[in-house]
């Protein structure tokens, strides 16, 4: 099985138990861009068609922001920003958590 097929299989197995909450830890890790897009669509469809709360944890904001309603940015185990994807893209605290203080943030 490919990496994407394995991820889909794991999600399918998890859904067999009809969970109320689905926790996906780094679901996009080690996947190619096409497979990431496919998995994002699966996650969005699950959100729209089921009564499951989905929690995604990932280090790559670009992968998460395409398939979530709201997100939190953590730094040193503390929430530094939360909101919709469009709000977080423009949030200086979120940018600083990802890029550090090395870059000037306008």
Where on the chain are the PLM-derived regions?
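Conserved catalytic motifs of ABC-family nucleotide-binding domains
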Residues: 18
């Amino acid at each position: 099985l490919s990496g994407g097929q394995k991820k889909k299989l794991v999600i399918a197995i998890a859904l067999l138990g009809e969970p109320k909450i689905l926790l996906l830890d780094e679901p996009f890790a080690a996947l190619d861009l096409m497979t990431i897009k496919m998995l994002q669509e699966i996650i969005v469809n699950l959100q729209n068609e089921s009564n499951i709360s989905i929690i995604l944890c990932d280090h790559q904001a670009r992968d998460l922001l395409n398939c979530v309603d709201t997100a939190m940015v953590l730094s040193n185990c503390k929430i530094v920003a939360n909101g919709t994807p469009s709000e977080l893209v423009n949030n200086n605290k979120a940018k600083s958590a990802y890029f550090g203080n090395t870059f000037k943030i306008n």
